[in-house]
A protein has these predicted regions:
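S-adenosyl-L-methionine
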Residues: 1-21
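Active-site phosphate-binding strand-loop segment of PLP-dependent enzymes
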Residues: 81-171
């Protein structure tokens, strides 16, 4: 049985029209999204007069706290509440000179978040925009001082993150984490076959990816992206990826009967879904049933260290896969199961 969901292990290739202008002087490829954030936070401390306060969204990965704390930042969280198709955030206490990190969740347009970016930029805050989930969307702000993303979350490179900002080059090096590269090389091909056939040990591949994450977390000294990965990204068939993700997300939206569980009920112009987010009171039982059918949903994050502010997503939100690896029939396989168990 074909597996739906899970990390990527292959890059769809076209000979031209990749996502990035490789020679853009403000574009820097690095080893991962985490390394990108690390470099940005280091550069801010050295290049700006700041308060050393970093505001993170209450719905975010724990890695952000760990990186910032190690660098001496005082990490504070701002509330993130999802209601009636919008994320509402509270940054009333952010002050001039503070550093604020934003992201557009799941690649869907969020006017309120864009308004907050503009407002806090005018307030005198330094703005970082994590564009990982909106990497292919046309809904990023024009007001951030720094942009970064994980490429690894979108396609099957061994290494891959990107920074878009001025003056970052002095903080980079050319050292590649070859331990990570060789580790991923050792199992990516077999994992790709597992996704197609369902034949293999899921626990083994999960442990391989977990080990890869530990390799990234334990080594921020080797900053560079593996050059063959840079070349692959230059040939990445982005048009195919965008088209398939939109098509698949629209199929999910159209065929899920209970529209109340959908956090977004349309794909707007310029949106390219990272996943299709769903909100359910009994999320864990639904995910467990989907998992038993070879459909692995994405629960993005657990509540990060020290986060006590309000957020209504950690226990109830999950993402349905809609990427280019899957067909309309695969999407209907997902919705058929959901429609059976969700009233």
């Amino acid at each position: 049985m074909k597996i739906i969901g899970g990390p990527f292990s292959k890059v769809p290739i076209k000979n031209k029209d990749g996502l990035f202008e490789i020679n853009d002087k403000n574009l820097y490829f690095v080893g991962s999204g985490r390394i990108a954030l690390y470099i940005i936070l280091v550069s801010i401390l050295q290049e700006h007069t700041v308060s050393s306060v970093l505001w993170l969204p209450a719905y975010y990965c724990d890695v952000g706290w760990h990186i910032a704390s190690q660098l001496g930042y005082i990490v504070k969280y701002y509330s993130v509440i999802f209601k009636d198709g919008n994320y509402t955030i509270d940054l009333a206490n952010a002050s001039e000179g503070d550093v604020v990190l934003f992201l557009n969740f799941y690649g869907f347009s969020q006017k309120k978040i864009q308004d907050e970016i503009r407002k806090n930029k005018k307030k005198g805050c330094i703005i970082i925009e994590d564009i990982t989930q909106s990497l292919l969307s046309n809904n990023k702000s024009d007001f951030a001082d720094y942009y970064f993303a994980s490429i690894r979350k979108w396609t099957g490179v061994f290494t891959g993150g990107v920074i878009y900002a001025k003056g970052i080059s002095k903080f980079l090096n050319q050292d590649v984490n070859l331990e990570l590269v060789n580790h991923n090389k050792s199992f990516f091909e077999d994992y790709q076959n597992y996704l197609i056939t369902g034949e293999g040990d899921r626990k083994y591949y999960s442990s391989c990816f977990y080990e890869a994450e530990l390799m990234i977390n334990s080594n921020y000294a080797k900053l560079a992206m593996y050059q063959p990965d840079v070349e692959l990204v230059g040939k990445w068939d982005v048009k195919l990826v965008i088209s398939k993700r939109i098509q698949n997300a629209e199929c999910l939206i159209r065929n899920i009967k209970n529209k109340d569980i959908l956090m977004f009920n349309e794909v707007k112009k310029g949106d390219v879904p990272f996943f299709l987010p769903v909100y359910l009171e009994d999320r864990d039982s639904v995910c467990k049933l989907l998992d038993s059918q070879g459909i692995y949903c994405s629960v993005l994050w657990e509540r990060p260290t020290g986060c006590q502010v309000e957020c209504n997503l950690y226990d109830n939100e999950f993402g349905l896969v809609c990427d280019e690896r899957y067909s309309i029939d695969d999407m209907k396989r997902i919705t058929d199961i959901i429609n059976e168990i969700v009233n």
